[in-house]
Amino acid sequence: MNDSETDSPSIKALIVFRENGETDNLFVPILCDAIRMAGIDVRCSTKEFWESDKHYDIIHFQWPEEVVGWTCNDPDIIRCLEERISFFRSRGARFVYTRHNVRPHYANGIISRAYDIIESQSDIVAHMGRFSRDEFLTKYPDSQNVVIPHHIYQYTYKEDISVERARQYLNLSQDAFIVTAFGKFRNREELRMVLGAFRAWDEAHKMLLAPRLYPFSRRNSYGKNFIKRWISKAGYYLLMPLLNRMYKLQAGANDELIDNCDLPYYMAASDVIFIQRKDILNSGNVPLAFLYHKVVVGPKVGNIGELLSETGNPTFDPDDKKDILRALEEARRLAAWGQGEVNYAYGMENMSIRKVGQAYAQTYKQAING
């Protein structure tokens, strides 16, 4: 270890995030390890934030929903949140907030208020791109902000998987040009955007790999509502296979998570990763794609559009089908020209776990020193 990794062993930090590991988003567990590697005494716990009277130098917020609950509707939680922040601040703690979202689409008034409190009470706000920083400054012109990129997922998934092996494992054509859209499709607009453009794309060997596309379920998701339950199961067992054959898709139900053991095979099997959001600030699928040497095509919005443009990956207007088709064509050419290797080199140089961990350690020191 060099000096920068060992000169702050006394800093105690609490990342307010569940500690039981029950999450399909590994951003925080990996970040916690990276910060620990940089010499910080850090732990993840939501319970610790609410119940402990231990001293911490840094309280590090991630998603405000992790603090108050993802479906919180208790108005008293806001008073409790303010009291806990005041308590830790009275003990000398400083607050850092990593801004993942502007506001979630489903946020109720209580969750929105939690965002307001955490945004305004944090001593330093960390952003994953300049877009987020500049937008935040318009609302909080006196805030302190830093830009720290999203880490790539080194040492997390199996990385040495060939395209051929991955496609064999997933039972996919070796000859297809595979465009993969990860993550749950959230609404009809995303479905229409992706399926409309993909159907119109003049690529003979195209295949869309979208493991969480369809709004159907084989589970009993609708309780006693027999009609909705029947429609959902009929869609799952009858419509999904039919639509997959008709439109050259390999798509599944949006309530079925990808197992972490299978995820690297989906990445390795792909030619291009498609970010299917129309309005989003950040996406972990971009750094993950960079780790797997893949070209990424995504919307010209948020930090995503900024990063893709800076690294030479195609972006598009999500409301313009012709522009999406242009971006897909450009992605196909870039995949053949080796843009994926350029992405990997960029990620390793600028988004490595080591570099991101050191940047957060430095941010902690900055917050403590004022």
Feature locations, PLM:
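Donor nucleotide-sugar binding/catalytic pocket of nucleotide-sugar-dependent glycosyltransferases
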Residues: 120-137, 141-158
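Conserved donor-binding/catalytic core segment of Leloir-type glycosyltransferases
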Residues: 172-189, 195-199, 209
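Nucleotide-activated donor-binding/catalytic signature segment of Leloir-type glycosyltransferases, i.e.
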Residues: 218-265
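Short acidic/histidine- and often glycine-rich active-site loop of Leloir-type glycosyltransferases
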Residues: 288, 301-315
